[in-house]
């Protein structure tokens, strides 16, 4: 007989083997050799366990592992791997992969995956869930050295290798040495009331590139970058969502995106967007540069805002050189897109402090002044001490509210537009350009080489250009350029006004064109010189086919000194759009006409009707004439001469062609006899020539 303890162990082994047969067959996918090896190992483990186990009775519970259960069963049998479990596996066979265990087993093997072998079943674990790589704990590195913060990396940097961000970082940093910071495509965000990046020192040379700078909120100048006395290069950056916070005792601030003082800043492929400054007198929603320089290549300055000057950017006593850049959809009270020059509370330096700005291959569009009652300069404000050259660029769809839809120039020096389109801008006065000259500088507006001031709309005066001289000299020169298709109440193309001893010059040189401007309320379709001005229109220019509501379809001069070309020498087709007839001269067009014999013989003005073909009253140009006058380039009354015939024309005879002539012209007498006899339809007849009949052509 067996001992009781041994019997119990034997029964436990039988039970364990039975339960193993009922478990999911997926837990036993190993081949017979592997099964034998594992069973032999378990026999050794079972023997060891049998010697040390204090409790001779083995009972299976849900807490036992597969290893414990199998070991007890093998101890009972005291057999090789060809024992009960092996025979059971041979009998049961390999199940189909479609078979899945039903319900919840009470042994640990019930959680074993279908791909596990018996060896793996000894330590069943859930499959590991793939996880994303951990975010580097270090913020930046220099070479192979890691740093927990960007500030630590800056402290360690010697400038020989760049600092490279390893992840998005929230940290305000200060750079006071020459180095390169590569954001690595990540975002550097501010977390305190300061600029995200402060750069200062003794002219350090700093490069920041390849990433985004955002979240700056500075109660001082510069939300994104605050730069002082440094040489800085910004490359492949987005600077967005930053703010310089003015008001509440902070005073005037500037540069929501970038503030630079006494610094030279270069930007290449940088977007400065949706930055702002607050406080009623704060400037430079996107960028503020003072006493320095700014170079831009392939940049976008867009959707920035300032309550005072320079929604996109402002340069005070600084120089801009911008190429292939866009300044779009910015807002401010003065100079919504770009503001050049002093602000009212800064001392005027006079023309000795001139700054020469250059913008090439760029677009300034969709900028709008915030104050419809007082705002000026939708596209840009060009102020005291500033000269500006624009080349191969566009100023489109800007709104200047009161003055200067595209450009307002206050006491600027020279503004030169070379191959520039100024189109579809709007303002109350000077929808294209509003220029005012004071005692500080002479102002010179130059339109060159195909520049077009076209399709701008002013609700007041100066659809294309408004020229206002308070003192000194203001000049507008156009050569091979166009001021056409503009609309205003009066002076739709160019309007001039002066006060005191100021001088205004308008010089339309060869190739200048003024067509299709429309004064919709009163006078001066192309040019309206309200008072004294010097107007010169050269031969090979073209000033015609403009319209005005009350007088002067093309020109209205009230006290100006003017010289006009022979109308037949103007360029273009010289065809009047209203009747398709040839333009051959200048004609009075409403308002008044000078009459030297009027009244007491000293001369005076007589009212005169608008030009029509029937009432045309020609003006013969005189060099430097100075009479008040309203003119239109047109033609006199037109006539058609035809034969006056009596009787039937003889067979084979053709009368001379009709002639269309203007009043005062000579006509050709037909070379025909007084009468001609002949036969028509077999009947003798006589054709009598009675001369020409004049027929008035009415258009």
PLM feature segments, named:
Residues 183-186, 205-215, 231-245, 264-278, ...:
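Right-handed parallel beta-helix
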Residues 1-3, 26-145, 152-155, 635:
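Low-complexity, acidic Ser/Thr/Pro-rich repeat tracts that form intrinsically disordered stalk/linker regions
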Residues 8-28:
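Sec-dependent N-terminal signal peptides of Gram-positive bacterial secreted proteins and lipoproteins
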Residues 153-170, 179-186:
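Glycine-rich repeat segments that build the extracellular carbohydrate-interaction surface of secreted
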Residues 135, 546, 572-621, 667-699:
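Surface-exposed interfaces of beta-sheet-rich extracellular modules
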Residues 170-180, 188-210, 214-232, 246-263, ...:
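Extracellular beta-strand-rich solenoid/capping regions of secreted or surface-exposed proteins
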Residues 172-174, 190-195, 217-223, 243-250, ...:
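Short glycine/acidic-rich loop motifs that flank beta-strands on beta-rich extracellular proteins
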């Amino acid at each position: 007989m067996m001992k009781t303890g041994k019997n119990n162990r034997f029964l436990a082994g039988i039970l364990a083997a039975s339960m193993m047969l009922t478990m999911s067959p997926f837990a036993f996918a190993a081949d017979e050799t592997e099964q034998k090896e594992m069973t032999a190992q378990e026999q050794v483990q079972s023997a060891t366990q049998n010697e040390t186990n204090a409790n001779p009775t083995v009972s299976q519970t849900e807490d036992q592992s597969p290893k414990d259960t199998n070991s007890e069963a093998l101890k009972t049998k005291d057999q090789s791997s060809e024992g009960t479990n092996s025979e059971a596996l041979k009998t049961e066979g390999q199940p189909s992969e479609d078979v899945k265990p039903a319900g919840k087993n009470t042994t640990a093997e019930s959680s074993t995956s279908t791909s596990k072998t018996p060896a793996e079943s000894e330590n069943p674990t859930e499959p590991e869930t793939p996880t994303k790589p951990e975010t580097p704990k270090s913020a930046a590195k220099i070479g192979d050295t890691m740093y927990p913060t960007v500030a630590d990396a800056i402290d360690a940097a010697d400038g020989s290798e760049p600092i490279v961000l390893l992840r998005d970082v929230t940290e305000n940093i200060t750079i006071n040495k020459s180095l390169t910071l590569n954001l690595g495509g990540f975002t550097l965000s501010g977390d305190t009331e300061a600029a995200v990046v402060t750069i200062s020192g003794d002219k350090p040379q700093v490069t920041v590139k390849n990433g985004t700078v955002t979240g700056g909120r500075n109660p001082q100048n510069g939300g994104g970058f605050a730069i002082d006395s440094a040489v800085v290069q910004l490359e492949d950056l987005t600077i967005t969502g930053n703010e310089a916070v003015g008001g509440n005792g902070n005073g005037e601030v500037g540069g929501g995106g970038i503030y630079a003082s006494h610094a030279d800043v270069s930007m290449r492929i940088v977007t400065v967007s949706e930055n702002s400054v607050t406080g009623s007198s704060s400037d430079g929603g996107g960028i503020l540069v003072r006493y320095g320089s700014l170079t831009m290549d392939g940049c976008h300055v867009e959707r920035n805002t300032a309550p005072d000057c320079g929604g996109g950017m402002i340069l005070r006593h600084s120089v801009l050189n911008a190429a292939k850049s866009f300044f779009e959809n910015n807002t401010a009270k003065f100079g919504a897109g770009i503001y050049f020059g002093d602000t009212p509370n800064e001392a005027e330096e006079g023309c000795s402090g001139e700054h020469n700005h250059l913008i090439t291959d760029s677009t300034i569009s969709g900028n709008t002044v915030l104050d419809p009652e007082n705002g000026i300069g939708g596209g840009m404000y060009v102020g005291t001490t500033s000269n500006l050259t624009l080349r191969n660029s566009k100023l489109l769809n800007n709104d200047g509210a009161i003055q200067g839809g595209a450009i307002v120039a206050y006491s600027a020096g020279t503004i030169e537009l070379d191959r520039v389109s100024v189109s579809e801008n709007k303002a109350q006065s000077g929808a294209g350009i509003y220029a005012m000259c004071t005692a500080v500088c002479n102002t010179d507006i130059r339109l060159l080489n195909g520049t077009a001031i076209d399709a701008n709309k002013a609700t007041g005066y100066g659809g294309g250009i408004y020229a206002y001289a308070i003192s000194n000299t203001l000049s507008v020169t156009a050569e091979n350029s166009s001021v056409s298709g503009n609309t205003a109440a009066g002076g739709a193309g160019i309007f001039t006004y002066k006060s005191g001893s100021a001088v205004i010059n308008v010089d339309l040189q060869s190739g200048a064109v003024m067509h299709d401007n429309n004064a919709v309320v009163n006078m001066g379709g192309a040019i309206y010189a309200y008072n004294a001005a010097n107007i010169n229109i050269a031969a090979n220019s073209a000033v015609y086919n403009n319209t005005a509501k009350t007088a002067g379809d093309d020109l209205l001069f009230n006290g100006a000194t003017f010289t006009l070309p022979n109308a037949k020498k103007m360029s273009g087709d010289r065809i009047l759009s209203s009747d398709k007839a040839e333009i051959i001269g200048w004609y009075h067009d409403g308002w008044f006409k000078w009459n030297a014999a009027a009244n007491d013989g000293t001369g005076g003005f007589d009212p005169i009707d608008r030009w029509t073909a029937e009432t045309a009253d020609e003006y013969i140009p005189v060099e430097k004439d100075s009479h008040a006058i309203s003119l239109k380039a047109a033609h006199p009354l037109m006539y058609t001469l035809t034969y006056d015939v009596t009787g039937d024309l003889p067979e084979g005879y053709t009368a001379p062609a009709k002639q269309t002539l203007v009043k005062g012209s000579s006509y050709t007498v037909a070379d025909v006899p007084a009468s001609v006899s002949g036969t028509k339809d077999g009947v003798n007849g006589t054709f009598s020539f009675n001369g020409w009949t004049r027929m008035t052509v009415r258009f």
